[in-house]
Amino acid sequence: MNKFYLYLLVFIAAIVLSCSKEKASDHVNLIETNVHHGRTEDYSESRNLYFGDLHVHTGWSFDAYMAKVRVTPDQAYKFAKGEPIPHISGKEVKMNRPLDFMAVADHAEYMGGLMQMQEEGNALYNWDLAQSIRSKDDDESKKATRKLRFSIATNWPYKQLIDKQNLQYTWKKMVEIADAHYEPGKFTSFPAYEWTSSVAVLKSLISGPPYAQNLHRNVIFKGGKVSGLPFSSFDSQNPEDLWEWMANQRNQGVELLAIPHNANISDGRMYALNTFDGDKLTAKYIETRLRNEPVNEVVQIKGQSMAHPLLAPKDEFADFEVYQYSLGQGNNRKKLKTEGAYVRQAFKNGLAIHQKFGQNPFQFGIIGSTDSHNGGPNVEENNNIGRSGTKDINAEHRLRKDKGGEVTRKTSVAGLAAVWAKENTRESIYEALERKEVYATSGPRIQLRFFASEDWQNVDFDNEKWDSLAYHNGVPMGSQISKGEVSPSFLISAVKDVDGANLDRAQVIKGWIDQEGQTHERIYDVAWSEGRSMDSEGNLPLVGNTVNIENATFTNDIGAISLQTFWSDPDFNPKFSSFYYIRVLEIPTPRWTTFDAVSLGVEVPDDVPSSIQERAWSSPIWYEPIN
């Protein structure tokens, strides 16, 4: 591109972006949705475990549509319930096991717009750009598609695609579809959308398309009253503006929360120690972030954001599904910063911020979800339906040898949100998210409990009501404790996925801050399968590996069905603020790339692991000294 035109383009974009404009989401009537009254048949005071996905895209998202995905939100909910749906490959696809809850969270930006371009009679059908996108001339169609992508990357939208009336119609349909699939006690569907703040690094235009720093959030509505229109990144790319809009919605009776995801590809901005504009943190900023973002999504198709080997060099299990490719730039994606991009480091930095402000902006719970752009959750390694239409349409395409294949192979088949709630309703699951009694898995349905107490004298795992007693005697994951000159006692219970692999070990991951303001971390193996013992250095041998790469199988000859224990911190200091969370590892199982290779009768790729240890991570329990 000629540099003169490049600079001119950036200059014009800056002027346009600086212009004040009425937000598309302003002055729109609220939408009334279904509210459940009374208890469902599955109600339990000691809470049930539900697995779901709060991040699924359909053909109503611009990027999914451009990848030839035509699945609708209605079909996506049917897929989550266990019904087959059409796939871009021409085949039908189906989950091995249905989910308990789900949210279709299509991008607010251009929501449904590309779908409307294909509908004769729609106002967008005869638009010049729509005609170019529909063109049978492949070059013309690709050029038009690039224009759309560029408009989003630079946050310079086409006015035809942000028409308030069109958006209102599409969003109302989205909410109505979620309502139609809501079956209290059986399946919960949430009205939701994705706020897609992708901050373009325009200097990259000199060498190619811009890359973007991912600051995306999924906005989940409890139900009852729902906003009349979503607040999109076209309204603002600044999370603080999103939070302000959310506060205004609450003033009108709307209950909603935001869930950040993919900190790993934020280029260090998701958990930065300053604001979006580069200013220092303030007490108001911290309080507002805490109020609006009680949980973060930490594992999905674009990898995990829990830990990175560069930030946790002593953690032998940190190098798991690491994905650091930027958004944009096609297949020439740059690798991104790790500082400010991973949860464990954020948890530690949060302790330091708490020392100064008395509040911690990173005191959030964690979940997994998929971010599937195929209209259905993709969490089963042996049943990979791909992540985004033509980008990875089938096994042959996913294992291709070019740069695009390399990037695709680094993606994951993951993850799930696990929620402890009294019943399968919007109200109960939403409240679990707010109190952070939730956890993340990379896909398996591992059952994980984590409690803290001063005294477990009445709790015994042999008592079938031990979980009820645990709530009576202690507090669950997501809580904060403050008492004690001695370590609190932690209750940990992990049970394998009934259809999955045995368990290797359960670990407590601790972070703390000392009196000099230095943060630290340590990992404790606290329960493990039989046949091993810890050495004098405190190291536990690996569990072994039964994976047969030639036929993509494994056996449960090693590992444990369940791991249960009580544990107290041997290094506890009552003066130090700290956090504790659980990581449960399965025994090794074949990765999706191995299943793909075996299905094709080709060599297993050597640029990714042939087997992985799937896992679950609990939300933390925080300890704060009383003073």
Regions found by a protein language model. Give the residues of each.
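Residue-level signal for mature regions of secreted extracellular proteins and peptides
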Residues: 12-13, 611
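C-terminal motif of bacterial Sec signal peptides marking the signal peptidase cleavage site
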Residues: 16-18
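The substrate-binding groove and active-site-proximal loops of carbohydrate-active enzymes
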Residues: 62-67, 155-168, 222-236, 332-341
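Cap/lid and interdomain-hinge subdomains that line or gate substrate/regulatory clefts
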Residues: 162-171, 210-214, 220, 234-259
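Conserved, charged catalytic cores of large soluble enzymes
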Residues: 225, 235-240, 318-321
